[in-house]
Amino acid sequence: MKMLDLYGYTSIAQSFDKICISIASPESIRAMSYGEIKDISTTNYRTFKVEKGGLFCPKIFGPVNDDECLCGKYRKKRYRGVICEKCGVEVTSSKVRRERMGHIELVSPVAHVWFLKSLPSRIGALLDMPLKLIESILYSGDFVVIDPIATPLSKGEVISESAYNQAKDNYGEDSFLALTGAEAIRELLVRLDLHAINANLRTELESTTSEMKRKKIVKRLRIVENFINSGNKPEWMILTVIPILPPDLRPLVSLENGRPAVSDLNHHYRTIINRNNRLGKLLKLNPPAIMIRNEKRMLQEAVDALFDSTRRSYVSNKAGSVGYKKSLSDMLKGKQGRFRQNLLGKRVDYSGRSVIVVGPNLKLHQCGLPKKMALELFKPFICSKLKMYGIVPTVKLANKMIQNEKPEVWDILDEVIHEHPILLNRAPTLHRLGIQAFDPVLIEGKAIQLHPLVCSAFNADFDGDQMAVHIPLSLEAQLEARILMMSTNNILSPSNGKPIIVPSKDIVLGIYYLTLQDQAQSEDEVLFFGDFSHVEYALHNKDVHLCSKIKYRMTYCNYDVEGNKPSYYSKIIETTPGRLILWQIFPQHKNLTFDLINQVLTVKEITSIVDLVYRNCGQSETVEFSDKLMSLGFKYASQSGISFGCKDMIIPDTKTMHVDNASDKIKEFAVQYQDGLITRSERYNKVIDEWSKCTDLIAKDMMKAISVYDEENKLNSIYMMAHSGARGSASQMKQLSGMRGLMAKPSGEIIETPIISNFREGLNVFEYFNSTHGARKGLADTALKTANSGYLTRRLVDVAQDCIVVEYDCKTHNGFAIRSVVEGGAVVETLDNIILGRVAAVDVYNPITEELLVKAGELIDEAKVEKIKIAGLDAVKVRSPLTCEAKKGICALCYGRDLAIGDVVSIGEAVGVIAAQSVGEPGTQLTMRTFHVGGTAMRGVETSNLIALLDAKAKLVNSNVVEDKHGNKIVMSRSCEIVLLDSVGNEKMRHNIPYGARLYVNDGQFVKITEKIAEWDPYTMPIITEKTGIIKYMDLIDGVSINEVLDESTGISNRVVVDWKLHLQGANLRPRLVLVDDNGNIITLSNGLEANYFIPIGAVLNVQDGQKVHAGDVITRIPRESIKTRDITGGLPRVIELFEARRPKEHAIVSDIDGYVEFGKDYYRSKRRIFIKPVDDKLTPVEYLVPKGKHTIVNEGDFVHKGDLLMDGDPDPHDILRVLGVEALANYMISEIQQVYRLQGVRIDNKHIEIILRQMLQKVEIFEPGDTMYLVGENIDMEEVIKTNNSMVKMGKSPAKYAPILQGITRASLDTNSFVSAASFQETTKVLTEAAFSGKEDSLYGLKENVIVGRLIPAGTGFLMNKIKKLSLLNKEDYSMYYDSEYQDPALLQSDSNNFGHDLPKGNNNIVDY
């Protein structure tokens, strides 16, 4: 331990390894107590001294004042340990009043409310009695038979009082034993034989067949086994002694007006003591039984109120009502409870807060600290220095000197502050960049100055934001602040690895202006320059302008293959003086050429330049470069004179034409609707589409008009702001000078009359009123969603907090194949973006040259990504946190690159928390951003066709095509896909072609870029005939299963299928269209089945009974819902739904096997049967029940693959896991979650989502227990099961079989191995009850548990400290052996009995050697 003392590391928090919790026995309560309390008196009302024998008795709890007894006889430290013979008080420190407990001996036992009422009731489960019966015994005076002796009554039977008296008369006084109240329950519990119950339940479990009964038995069996294993006795759930909290934890404080403020607990204790004493006196008087029973009930209620007042059914006892007294449970749970208020978050000394202002002249690592603030914060440091230099003799005089602000004080303050970093924090701290360290610079004034480039990390602006300052005191804290938290060390964002110190707003505008080029300049006016000094001179003399075109002699540098021996050559290039000015601040590196900036730089280019500089030149160069870039940006933004002018909003001349065209088309749709050619929802969809197109066209023309470079005004200011990415966007410009477009109602529906005006023209009253919808919804949403998003972050942090990097390599070869992400035909995320920073799971070869590109277990960095890109690979297998085999955490290689530093992650990094923050932080950002577009509908035109994005060869998969009467090829397959292959045959793109689409290419045909491959109607789902024949209606009965729906506005009737189940005669109908030949025989389709087309509710029939149809004709249409706008408002609930692993409301059914679809002949109540017939006839078909009227997306005879959807809707993640396994689940969840974030333009690395998923997949369900003690259907930790199975195999017994299960993040947080962590999260009383009767141990592995008990967290520096601690406990031989062989034999660490966690291989500099 000496080694630990070096670090000041031994304290009470370090002196234990785990925390255990169990039910307190009466003996242990008495042992903890220093005396029994029988009196309710607190303090004397005249002397204000505490009363002896009362609730604050000094004899029991210790002296009120340090080293002073009550009567004042002994008053010095020298009498410590003496017990005063006069007043009986021990002379000691008054601190013991925070530790010493008392107790109350109860005259009659009472039930502990947690074990009685916390569901499932533990007492009820052990006795196998419903809660209602137990309550009737405890509160209503019913009797329970304990021992029937010689009567026909049965043991445990509950009888009313009258029945009890009747039985006494019938059988005699002592012929049976029946009791009431808590004594009865206690007696029953004492007489339980848990081992016998356990054996009986196990035999019963084997014989039972009913699922409900099984679940009930398993529940009870778990509780019984937990009791047996924990060593708790059942009768301890009934209290005979109540402990009393130490008095300083329930203090009596006198207020200013002399009235005492009493803690609520004292009120509860007084009630209990009063009722207990009264009951004791009553019992001596031998009164009628009813009085005793009433008094006992009141005592029971008083004890209930002390432990948990919310569990009582009284109205007056609801929290928040007048007269409500806080119970012990209330003190623990909720945001204001002990866990969350005092243990996980504490107020901090040495801190201050103030408003922030911008500090453009600061360096990146500095912040401006007001002198007044610094003086107060560093006061103790200044005092000690003043004394040390002998300026003042005492601290008191030093304080006086500081108060008077003498000149010496300022000098010393400068010295103290020098290289002493301070922490700045802005609430809400959504990710770790919300707290960063800076070197303070003293400034006048009262506001903190903040560097502009760190604003995006803090999400700060200067409209009145406040920030808090904290001072790291100890040397270690200062060291950590400087090395880990300094703003210069946090250049990259931990969520996506892109720079977060990027210029924005004015800086971008300045750089954009600096790199512009004058388009109107003629070739004759172009000047030649050979040196930068000449360019500066010409600028000074106004011979050239910043944006003028010039010819310049640029020196280039050539490197040989190894990158050494540079050779120089010159080249004349066309550029501008502005770009040359920018080039002067660039660091020199072979990968940073002038071509990078010889273009107009927008925010996107600037970001990639900062990224390049970081990757090539390192951190310090990047910091310097960013600072210079910022000053340049500010300088030229102010010189440019760009401002927002009314004339800059140019309204395109074509606007009226576009609006007229759209109006004409909409009139056409109205006519079609009147003629009954289209339905109401189709017309609505088409109108919305038309206006969307019109708005886009106007916006396009506006951008064309606005981006023209004219001689007079040069470039348009507003265009420059939007184009550079400094402020505003194309959609905002569209609203300013194009057309505001369609608005959304609060419900998400789109109002079909658009706002034709823009803000430049001004809106009319009607338009203004329409646009208020969206604006208000935006503001209301913001308020609601912020809370939702914050709660999501809290749950994510809680589920992932114990995921830490514990070793370098877990040696696994598992991983996932990664492909690029394609959405709607376009590649939205390229392969190289996804695999960058991951580790290859297997060797990666070039398919053509067979050259080894990446070795297995090697990090894929930028250079390797480039190789993979050149090789044209479309999939790479990489390691993933989900497949990592490390125990108690993950390994560095499965995680890959730490995105914030761009290198392999260090051991001890808390990757779980980083993942949670990365996923949660944008949620809050986005929810706060809903109203930025002012509620305009963000919906694009629905995709209705597929266009080739590259020259390629088309290959059709699962295609079943028929030709219609016009010769068009119609897709008849539900799973038709088109794959585009490049010249080598690598798959470049894969698309689904919907059923009913018109196909324009053949299998194997070459398609050119922009060629149309297929098109379809996005608003209806058709049902199409496969052969030519005559239509016959079956079970389509007017008024039952089909209605003529008359459209009031058009007078035309459509035949619509209605819900036939609602009708009496409709019970056995199966509405369908049948295709027959001329002889009336049903036609057989190509798959050998009859041509029956089943029709769902809501479908519109396109054909009459007896009508002749051609192959490829649409016979019915199912209108799709009109699409609502999707912003993160719809998106955040979706993310929450996925992380909570909830079943979607109307989830699609997933096929469990490969096979052919067959519709069941009978209808089953309100369900419809679908059979999947396996290819192998020996296997039995699988049956699915689909709700009637739901549209199945498969036809009879279709071949479906395992995991295909059989009907519309989102699939259930649990089904995907069960049918297709972990990899498919991971792919589904990642793509769904990323889709929501991508919609908002937020980039999150997949590995963060994978880590959360890993935490959600930690439990398995046992379906065959083998020889283990597990029960069928039980959910157990996967690591534990693997461990048990290994030991079973060693003993030659059969192991348990299990399947992984997916838990939502809340469930997973509550089911964690640490009860301390779970209790501090949610449902505190429930978690503690569960933990207590199971006698749980908490080994303090996670971060949260350690914060709560006051230790260093086992991550980062704490990870190393833990290792040192374990090493210090080794004996000398082991210790030296560990260090001797550490680098020679890595296996020693693997099999380390002391469980040090595994180490880095030799040569990695992340380990500090002590």
From Swiss-Prot:
A single cellular component GO annotation: DNA-directed RNA polymerase complex
Xref: Gene3D superfamilies: 1.10.132.30, 1.10.150.390, 1.10.1790.20, 1.10.40.90, 2.40.40.20, 2.40.50.100, RNA polymerase II, clamp domain, RNA polymerase Rpb1, domain 3
Record field: catalytic activity: RNA(n) + a ribonucleoside 5'-triphosphate = RNA(n+1) + diphosphate
Enzyme Commission code(s) on record: 2.7.7.6
GO BP, sorted A to Z: DNA-templated transcription
Binding site residues for Mg(2+): D461, D463, D465
Residue numbers binding Zn(2+) 2: C810, C884, C891, C894
GO MF terms, alphabetically ordered: DNA binding; DNA-directed RNA polymerase activity; magnesium ion binding; zinc ion binding
Pfam family, one: RNA_pol_Rpb1_1
Alphabetical list of InterPro entries matching this protein: DNA-dir_RpoC_beta_prime, DNA-dir_RpoC_beta_prime_bact, RNA_pol_asu, RNA_pol_N, RNA_pol_Rpb1_1, RNA_pol_Rpb1_3, RNA_pol_Rpb1_3_sf, RNA_pol_Rpb1_4
Top enzyme class: transferase
Note on cofactor: Binds 1 Mg(2+) ion per subunit. Binds 2 Zn(2+) ions per subunit.
Positions contributing to Zn(2+) 1 binding: C69, C71, C84, C87
Coiled coil (residue ranges): none
Keywords associated with the record: DNA-directed RNA polymerase, Magnesium, Metal-binding, Nucleotidyltransferase, Transcription, Transferase, Zinc
UniProt cofactor(s): Mg(2+); Zn(2+)
Protein biosynthesis among keywords: no
Quaternary structure note: The RNAP catalytic core consists of 2 alpha, 1 beta, 1 beta' and 1 omega subunit. When a sigma factor is associated with the core the holoenzyme is formed, which can initiate transcription.
Family: Belongs to the RNA polymerase beta' chain family.
Biological function: DNA-dependent RNA polymerase catalyzes the transcription of DNA into RNA using the four ribonucleoside triphosphates as substrates.
Record-linked NCBIfam families: rpoC_TIGR (TIGR02386)
Protein name from the UniProt record: DNA-directed RNA polymerase subunit beta'
Species whose genome carries this gene: Ehrlichia canis (strain Jake)
Phylogenetic lineage: Bacteria, Pseudomonadati, Pseudomonadota, Alphaproteobacteria, Rickettsiales
The gene coding this protein: rpoC
